[in-house]
């Protein structure tokens, strides 16, 4: 049985992180933290960069680990069109590895063809959740309605993107 790590002491100051990337143009940003303060700080920076004065649009990728109910609640608490969050269920891989794999695969393939759908692309290095912890089809559909991107498990316990969406839900 794998248990969650303990002993951490929160997320870093995202304002300091953002100040270190002055006017560099990053199309894809991997966000290893999904606490409200960190996501709001990054969201505000992305909105400023997206605006008419800078026009250096980008999207951030993050992940959320939790039960179906916890993941729905997290998704419904956000409304960010420049952040995409993939639900991990209870995968043994940590969320920062999910976010890195998700961002890396999306960035690579979208640079080749920005209109390419990302479904079925394998997330390298990611371990599948136990069968009892995997989201069912109807649960994954509800996650999408709550602004959470979904994954599927292919034969051999290979994890792949099922549907990539942003966390934007309400206009």
Where are the predicted features?
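Polar low-complexity, Ser/Thr/Gly/Ala/Asp/Asn-rich disordered segments used for subunit assembly
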Residues: 1-96
